[in-house]
Amino acid sequence: MNYPEHIRDIKLNLLMSENTITIDPSKRKSKFAFLRPGYGLVKQLIKMGAIVTGSRALKCYKINGKQLFDRKPRDWDFIVTEKMAMKICDEHGVTYKDGSIMVLKQMILFRDSSYGDSRVVPTDIQLIVKDELPEYREVDGIRFSELSHIIDEKYKLVSPHHNSMNKHDEDLRQIIARFNNL
């Protein structure tokens, strides 16, 4: 599939057309999310201003009343500043030196032990550390990454240099198909 062409068309359409883009924050979690271990950390991140991004944020977006994405997200992706990440680490007794977190390409991964990684909380939560927070939309006190930013990041993840191509490839195909059917 020629992703650059489709992504360019989508981004131009988002900029130039009169589509109504809304966010339904209730779509970010299941009805029983509060029962999952680690949900306290999710609430803490939202309260401190972390930006929800990735598949979970995509699931919340609607264009002209139609949901753009419907895959059930398995993890939480947040964009945070280094200061925010350090605060979370301090509050959970985690340091870079103790091996409890992995730092890969500016991402701090809090992973479930079933993946073989050290864990802080038994829910997949990825903190993507940036020098500055990207543009976002805030709805009901929750910050969501801009739709174009999420699509750009998904595209970067299907480049030949990444291993997690299948999930992100399928996500982009779904977004393109649904966007073309608006």
Predicted regions and their residues:
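Short, low-complexity, polar/charged sequence segments that are solvent-exposed and flexible
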Residues: 70-72, 97-101, 163-164
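Residue-level recognition of short, structured coil/turn motifs
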Residues: 47, 93-97, 180
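Active-site nucleotide-donor binding segment shared across nucleotidyl transfer reactions
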Residues: 38-89
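Short N-terminal secondary-structure initiator segments
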Residues: 2-12, 90-101
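Conserved catalytic core of two-metal-ion nucleotidyltransferases
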Residues: 93-136
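Catalytic cores of NTP-dependent nucleotidyl/adenyl transfer enzymes across multiple folds
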Residues: 2-28, 74, 118-182
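Signature of uroporphyrinogen-III synthase
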Residues: 26, 34-38
